A protein has these predicted regions:
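N-terminal leader/targeting segments and the immediately adjacent pre-domain N-terminus
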Residues: 17-111, 136-139, 249, 404-407
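Structured C-terminal helix/loop/strand segments within mature extracytoplasmic catalytic/sensor domains
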Residues: 23, 364-407
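Active-site-adjacent helix/loop patches that line small-molecule binding or acyl-intermediate pockets
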Residues: 64, 147-268, 304-307, 312
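Active-site-proximal alpha-helical segments within enzyme catalytic domains
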Residues: 124, 128, 188-191, 235-242, ...
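Active-site-proximal binding-pocket segments
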Residues: 255-256, 260-334
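Active-site Gly/Thr loop motif
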Residues: 278-291, 334-384
């Protein structure tokens, strides 16, 4: 009986060991730093010819915007008041992208190593550093008012310091008005705040103002927080300044240490603010970054690093077994906004009603920036697609072509 019991235990251990090995073989693949494995589509049972069609589609459906960054910014926003660029802009490249299936690169086009402005995909990085602050208890809850965390901030103004003149404009308090004191991190993240004010020389009303009487629009009654969705980069920049106030260190450093380095991103990405968005924090001069390229600045990054970030969000914040940002945060980011069900936290565009991408599953999401620059995340197909400078009306066509290769 004793021999039988020992034999049974031995078999049980052996079987479990074998199961463990099988499980390990099936574990998700995550690329190491500077070493991302490529696999031929046929190795993963993908249709190579169809993927080639998808690449051809991407290459022939380039955005019509100018390659000259300054000219493109002017063409997009030049008719707005206070539209002058105040952050870096560069010449952009042509169409580029990568297709990531089960963690492996199975196709690419253009120059994926080229560092280009990513425009409002930057907002996804901004919401991520706020999520890190929530995970660490630095922000107790997204339902807290932002004003509780932000005190008056000194603007770095060397000209004023040299002259000895200290104007009221040298100190800013972006959440001090009666309306702004009501705003929570939640409504700021969802772009339903209707924040009022001027920041870095840009009034909130000057961003994509409606046609008609501008004075009437400027002096209108403010919407209750959470009731109306409006895409507005001044408000995004106010959120970035609030996040800087919480972290008390430059947000690019926060992102680098907690997200980009752990996922093996390159050393080539940069996150810029504006020439006039420098502040003094704890005696240190630091730049408050922008949440996009509306007036220049924001994130400049290559397609591979975009893909790594997409892979992180596809796995709900987990990278090779390490939870870099909580699954709860990703769940919140993927929760539709009441005032716009196609939007979660910035800049997670949701396909809940399949209006964004009719060809894709309803549970997909896309990090989108003007250009268009996109990071498509598809958990049903274990798929991430990075596409740069794809025509806005051609996003679904590209994804449709790729999904035909996966099915």
């Amino acid at each position: 009986m004793k021999k039988f019991t020992l034999f049974t235990v031995f078999i049980f251990i052996a079987l479990n060991s074998s199961f463990g090995q099988t499980k390990a073989k099936k574990a998700d693949y995550f690329p190491a730093y500077n070493n991302w494995q490529h696999k031929a589509p046929s190795q993963l049972m993908l249709d190579s010819a169809q993927l080639n069609k998808a690449i051809s589609f991407a290459m022939t459906h380039e955005a019509k915007s100018s390659h000259d960054g300054a000219l493109s910014q002017f063409q997009s926003f030049g008719k707005e008041p206070f539209s002058e660029a105040i952050g870096p802009l560069t010449e952009r490249g042509g169409p580029a992208g990568i297709i990531i299936y089960k963690g492996y690169i199975v196709a690419q086009w253009g120059d994926p190593e080229r560092v280009d402005i990513v425009n409002s995909v930057t907002k996804s990085f901004l919401s991520t550093v706020i999520g890190l602050a929530v995970d660490r208890g630095m922000i107790h809850s997204t339902m807290d008012t932002v004003a509780r965390y932000v005190s008056p901030i000194e603007v770095y103004n060397p000209a004023a310091q040299l002259s000895g003149y200290n104007a009221d404009g040298d100190m800013i308090n972006p959440f001090s008005s009666a309306h702004d004191r009501r705003l929570t991190w939640e409504v700021m993240l969802r772009q339903t705040s209707d924040w009022e004010g001027t920041l870095w020389g840009k009034p909130d009303w000057a961003d994509r103002p409606p046609a008609g009487d501008i004075e009437q629009y400027k002096n209108r009654k403010r919407n209750d927080p959470g009731t109306v969705w409006k895409y507005n980069d001044v408000r995004v920049n106010a959120l970035a300044l609030a996040a800087l106030s919480v972290w008390r260190k430059p947000l690019p450093q926060v992102l680098k240490e907690n997200i980009m380095d752990p996922i093996g991103a390159s050393a080539t990405w940069r996150w810029f603010g504006y020439r006039n968005s420098w502040v003094v924090m704890d005696g240190q001069i630091m730049q408050s970054v922008s949440g996009g390229g509306h007036w220049g600045g924001g994130m400049f990054i290559n397609a591979y690093d975009m893909g790594r970030f997409g892979l992180l969000t596809l796995h709900h914040g987990n990278w090779n077994g390490k939870q870099l940002i909580s699954e709860q945060w990703v769940k919140q980011a993927l929760t539709p906004t009441a005032a716009n069900t196609g939007y979660g936290y910035m800049n997670w565009f949701l396909n809940t009603d399949k209006k964004l991408l009719p060809s894709a599953p309803a549970n997909t999401w896309v990090h989108i920036g003007n250009g268009n620059n996109i990071i498509y995340c598809d958990p049903d197909h274990d798929l991430v697609v990075v596409a740069r400078w794809i025509d806005n009306n051609s996003m679904d066509g590209l994804i449709n072509n790729i999904l035909q290769a996966v099915k």
